[in-house]
Regions:
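Non-ligating segments of multi-cofactor redox enzymes
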Residues: 1-266, 271-274, 278-299
Length: 299
């Protein structure tokens, strides 16, 4: 927009000494890990709820993340449901009922919110990423970037393999499902596969599974396109340091924060954003915030 172009021009003309002073002042303000801590608490609570419900046989939340029942309501992971229907080669009506509930939930909350706020593998991969970054600083490992289009290719491969074999191929190797079942029913040999993935991410490619392979993220990303819950970027206060992109699982959604690239003074991040809140916690100027579309008009 014209207003965005004016802001970009003003930033180009700004006195560098004054800008550096403003940056130093912004970094002096305390900022913690508020959203990260909230997210970790929710993720751990959700997964422990499954385990406790099964262990105490209270039958409030039954099953696992792939398919469950909450006080009588059937909940079926969208990707799992798709795999089952592809394997059976027809639409299963009872499966659709449970799927619709989950579909509505993640359409409202933002599809990939599932990844950062519920998926147990995401939490382990986040911790593994910290180890990877520590080793990278010591120059003991390097980060091999891959083409993110690989995720689409893997989605198609899993779908075709399931359709052709009549077997839910992805569910057999899904770290999300493996970890969820292990937490509820006890560990199994499949955890070795999860350990191998984490080792690969620590030594070779940071967050490789979530960035380049997992079809769950792609499916939920599409579901969350129209979600009212999003992270909003405000151009005016941004110093374009790029700290937010360094902590982001999907840094391509933050391309708009690169100096000169924002097309408007306020930009909503794309559907691939996991709403993890790390960028919100990291930004020293508050240029990135959570937002619910339309809520400001109602208040």
């Amino acid at each position: 927009t014209e207003r965005a172009q004016q802001v970009h021009e003003l930033k180009r003309m700004a006195n560098k000494t004054e800008v550096r002073a403003a940056i130093m002042l912004a970094h002096q303000k305390p900022h913690g890990n508020t959203w990260r801590n909230r997210r970790w608490a929710v993720l751990i609570a959700v997964n422990l709820f499954f385990a406790v419900s099964f262990g105490l046989d209270i039958q409030i939340l039954e099953g696992a993340l792939t398919a469950s029942r909450f006080i009588g309501f059937h909940l079926i992971d969208l990707n799992s449901a798709l795999q089952v229907m592809l394997a059976h080669k027809h639409i299963i009506v009872n499966l659709l009922i449970g799927t619709m509930t989950v579909l509505v939930i993640w359409m409202l909350l933002g599809g990939r919110t599932f990844c950062s706020w519920v998926c147990p593998y995401h939490l382990l991969a986040e911790w593994a990423e910290k180890l990877h970054l520590f080793l990278a600083r010591k120059k003991l490992v390097t980060d091999q970037n891959m083409n993110r289009r690989l995720r689409t290719a893997f989605w198609l491969v899993f779908a075709l393999a399931t359709f052709g074999s009549g077997y839910t191929v992805f569910e057999a190797i899904s770290p999300t499902g493996i970890l969820s079942r292990a937490l509820i029913y006890g560990p199994g040999v499949a955890l070795l596969w999860v350990a191998a993935l984490l080792l690969f991410e620590i030594v070779i490619s940071r967050r490789a599974w979530c960035r380049y392979a997992c079809p769950i993220g792609l499916t939920y990303g599409v579901v969350g396109i129209l979600s009212p819950v999003r992270i909003k970027y405000k151009l005016d206060g941004c110093f374009h340091e790029g700290d937010c992109r360094k902590v982001c699982l999907v840094p391509h959604v933050l391309e708009t924060v690169v100096k000169g690239r924002a097309v408007d003074t306020e930009v909503t991040l794309g559907p691939d954003c996991t709403r993890c809140g790390l960028c919100v916690d990291t930004c020293p100027t508050g240029s990135l915030t959570f937002d619910i579309k339309g809520l400001s008009k109602l208040l």
